[in-house]
Swiss-Prot record:
Its cofactor is Mg(2+); Ca(2+); Mn(2+); Co(2+). InterPro entries: THDP-binding, Transketo_C/PFOR_II, Transketolase-like_C_2, Transketolase-like_Pyr-bd, Transketolase_bac-like, Transketolase_BS, Transketolase_CS, Transketolase_fam. Thiamine diphosphate binds at H65, G113, P114, L115, G155, N184, H260, F436. Mg(2+) binds at D154, N184, I186. Its EC number is 2.2.1.1. PANTHER family: TRANSKETOLASE, TRANSKETOLASE 2. Keywords: Acetylation, Calcium, Magnesium, Metal-binding, Thiamine pyrophosphate, Transferase. The modification N6-acetyllysine is found at K342. The lineage of its organism: Bacteria, Pseudomonadati, Pseudomonadota, Gammaproteobacteria, Enterobacterales. It holds the Pfam family Transketolase_C_1. The record marks H25, H260 as: Important for catalytic activity. This is Transketolase 2. It comes from the Bacteria.
Amino acid sequence: MSRKDLANAIRALSMDAVQKANSGHPGAPMGMADIAEVLWNDFLKHNPTDPTWYDRDRFILSNGHASMLLYSLLHLTGYDLPLEELKNFRQLHSKTPGHPEIGYTPGVETTTGPLGQGLANAVGLAIAERTLAAQFNQPDHEIVDHFTYVFMGDGCLMEGISHEVCSLAGTLGLGKLIGFYDHNGISIDGETEGWFTDDTAKRFEAYHWHVIHEIDGHDPQAVKEAILEAQSVKDKPSLIICRTVIGFGSPNKAGKEEAHGAPLGEEEVALARQKLGWHHPPFEIPKEIYHAWDAREKGEKAQQSWNEKFAAYKKAHPQLAEEFTRRMSGGLPKDWEKTTQKYINELQANPAKIATRKASQNTLNAYGPMLPELLGGSADLAPSNLTIWKGSVSLKEDPAGNYIHYGVREFGMTAIANGIAHHGGFVPYTATFLMFVEYARNAARMAALMKARQIMVYTHDSIGLGEDGPTHQAVEQLASLRLTPNFSTWRPCDQVEAAVGWKLAVERHNGPTALILSRQNLAQVERTPDQVKEIARGGYVLKDSGGKPDIILIATGSEMEITLQAAEKLAGEGRNVRVVSLPSTDIFDAQDEEYRESVLPSNVAARVAVEAGIADYWYKYVGLKGAIVGMTGYGESAPADKLFPFFGFTAENIVAKAHKVLGVKGA
């Protein structure tokens, strides 16, 4: 039995699964099988019986369409992925979806498919490994020591995100990040030389990567020597450029775009079996090949060795060991609830008129000392986003730091933070202007899809940004985030709601939270202790006239002040007015029906929503009989205090809308 036989097991399973599903991508798994065989059998440190072992190597398949490569590897090495699951490739409720998805399949470290983002996740994983090692490793006690390996294709390197993240990886000198470039020269449209003629080696050398120039990706010895060389380079990430043939083994489709994204066809699969010397029926793997691939015994020994290291570490450094375990398990500090609630109550008792971006920074200063797991950063807007707090230390200055200067890389930043979140041991936060979530949008969506624990700080949230004008003024962005499944948003109206938003964002384990913050100063509102508690429910009654409301005014963020002014005017007319603060629509929507009804009673149809964002979103709360004071187009370049009245954000306009809803004559 040869190494080719072991690699051919991957090729056969990949061909068979794609053929049975009548859907999928056989070419890349067949082309990268030899590389994967060497990496997984000779180098990868992992334990199939415990896929979450803290010190395992991380393997990322950035070209996620090649998912059958990964599923074949997981099945062959002994993960809980039986053959039946491979037969159900791309079928409903299988553990083998079309693209790898974290949480579905044991051993899958991240969800990949949108090209280039797996590479970004890998950079995040490598950052997390190095930072965690610097924070916890002690002389003679190295408990964090693993590599991050990432497979990528031509498409990954064409995507702009690859530039963002590989540039940063080189700047940070991530020596334990090793990339494998599947240079097969084929994409969906055909031979890439018509649209991708970059000198990839020079490109990555310019990023300060160690580049191992083109090796034969079908020569196991060349692959092995390249990996050994890459592992020996400690101060730079490494890229191994592997010349491969897409659809390797297919007599008529190898090296052609026909092998990329469609089944080979039964006749071609049979011919490929003959050419590869694989004389076994579909989905049949000989016992001796299973035995050669089985990584369970080796993995259990590796983990047991680490367990012994950790036991010695725990004996020598009990407090560090306890903290390491807490952070890797995602737990919160012991005094978290008591300390955060005390801070929130103190804010309410000491009113301040400040921007919510400043309130966010103040909250970081209050919560940060309790949370060494915070690993923050901004896309070159730290002085504006106010994401640097008194305990921030740049990773560039200190490997054990807690702050990343991401540069102008919004997309890369967000996807890197997803990788940091997946690694464990950290709660990443990222920041930019709300408008520039547009650059980061797909990574933000992926965070929600993957249930990544990332906090996104988006400041300058509206026309309140002012003079920079409509290119920088967010209008539809918040509504877009609110409409994203499993994406939590907070638009606080003052420092108290901002502190509650940060608290719940840190506590959320199953998805991202965006904090939508103002540039301009906002007045603090009065609250009772019960109202302070109800902020955490996403929406609550902030002001009430008593009795059944004649009209309900709903507001968020910077528009709360004028809404309260409008309520005073309406109350002066003898009307019962209720003001509802709705900083988090998703959290409010998740409350029980009784609570939601107590805040927004269904028998009160007269409602006006006020928010300096796109108006359409608010019809779900005001109904077709209600009114909205919101944006219906883009902003303008002018001082903020001129823009708000120009676009109708005044107490007088809210009153006028209320009159119309109430049917006041002449309104």
